[in-house]
Design a protein with these regions (language model features):
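Beta->alpha loop/short-helix hinge microenvironment recognizer with preference
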Residues: 1-393
Length: 393
């Protein structure tokens, strides 16, 4: 048995995905994701070829797949998204709130991903809006960003919503109202309201016969079993987690980057691979969050990864309240004027890939790495009769 210690998610897919596909017949969007990951930066998506005008040095760059599930394609979208948020971030307190659901609901949620992921957003936003408008908590309209994650550290199925909440808002007189240094909503109240709203939507979808039941969820087609499930979920305390506040616009922007374009697992967590297994590191929350190695079969690794491929065209990052697309242009400007804070200007807006590389990494790909001359697209007739069209990365 040969063990490879320097390997990536792409390597794992190349070795184990073909057999996984034969055994499991995955849906089309899973097959597309696998194709993208296996072929990213291999030339399958086109190439950029450039030639130095002075020394003739040739540079070939394989294009990336741009899949939102590919570990090699998240940096540019993340940097552009975070940069765009600078214009809407205020120098005010922010809070990180996490909404989770009991594991008993996992099988039904996985069988109805689009519907019940949407329901998570609906319940979380309705909870925050309702409680924030209550005068005994804040009495204001707030702004927040919701981001869906579906994984735990071991790539187990664990759907939850990360929410970045502005620690203040506009009251009925359009005046700024702040939280006063601590989170304005009691965790117990958030948990109960969120539980009620999510289960209400789940019941409504059941009553309208919109739910599907596959695999271990099939038993809940029976109305009595479904009612038992709801009763059990009503009895449980749903975990709502809130991190301490973080102040300052730059801190908020940096913090956002940890959650917005994350995927189920990154390359640096893959430790080794054999002909049949993959070893990666996971957080052991029963042991104070220490990292430990976990070894599973290659096909099981693929199965776990594929659980977290979002439905086609699903929007994972959503803005609400003062930060919604409809409100942020006027209301964030008004809030900024009330708070007396400066506007942060986007630096990456309208930049192409070459310009972004220069700004982010201080590398000028238009200059030859050998002599410093200008790199240009080669002439088709000079270098190859079958030269591929020049494509932007």
């Amino acid at each position: 048995m040969i063990m490879e210690k320097s390997c990536t998610i792409q390597d794992v897919f190349e070795r184990f995905y073909p057999s996984y596909e034969k055994r499991n017949n995955p849906p089309a969007h899973h097959r597309k994701t696998a194709y993208h990951i296996m072929n990213c930066k291999t030339g399958a998506f086109g190439v950029n070829i450039s030639v130095c005008e002075d020394c003739g040095c040739i540079s070939i760059h394989n294009n990336s797949c741009r899949s939102r599930c590919c570990p090699m394609c998240q940096e540019f979208p993340k940097e552009k998204w975070i940069d765009a948020q600078k214009e809407n971030v205020l120098d005010a307190p922010y809070y990180h709130v996490v909404f989770t659901v009991p594991e008993e609901l996992n099988s039904i949620i996985y069988s109805n991903q689009k519907l019940l992921y949407d329901a998570l957003y609906h319940a979380a936003s309705a909870t925050l809006n309702e409680l924030a408008k209550d005068a005994k908590y804040l009495g204001a309209n707030i702004g927040y960003i919701c981001i869906l994650h579906t994984w735990g550290s071991a790539m187990n199925y664990h759907p939850h919503i990360h929410t970045i909440v502005l620690g203040g808002g506009l009251d009925d007189e359009n005046k700024w109202k702040e939280t006063g240094g601590k989170f304005f909503l009691p965790y117990g109240v958030i948990s109960k309201v969120f539980r009620g709203k999510y289960l209400d939507e789940l019941k409504s979808l059941w009553n309208d016969s919109k739910l599907k039941f596959h695999g271990t969820a099939e038993k809940y087609q029976n109305s009595y079993r479904f009612k038992e499930l709801l009763d059990k979920c009503y009895e449980k305390n749903w975990v709502t987690y809130c991190k301490e506040t973080f102040n300052g616009a730059q801190s908020v922007i940096n913090y956002l980057g940890k959650y917005t374009h994350r995927i189920a697992i990154s390359n640096h967590r893959i430790k080794s691979m054999t002909d049949t297994t993959v070893t990666y590191v996971v957080k052991d929350y029963k042991n104070e969050g220490c990292w430990k190695e976990k070894t599973i079969s290659g096909e099981e690794f693929i199965r776990r990864f594929m659980m977290h491929v979002p439905p086609k065209r699903f929007v994972r990052i959503r803005h609400y309240g003062l930060l919604s697309c409809r409100n942020k242009r006027k209301k964030i400007t008004h809030c900024r004027n009330l708070l007396g804070c400066k506007k942060y200007i986007s630096t990456l807006k309208n930049l192409n890939a070459v310009e972004m590389i220069k700004v982010l990494y201080h590398i000028d790909v238009c200059k030859c790495s050998s002599c410093g001359g200008n790199m240009v697209s080669p002439r088709k007739d000079k270098y190859s009769s079958s030269f591929r069209a020049h494509m932007r990365c």
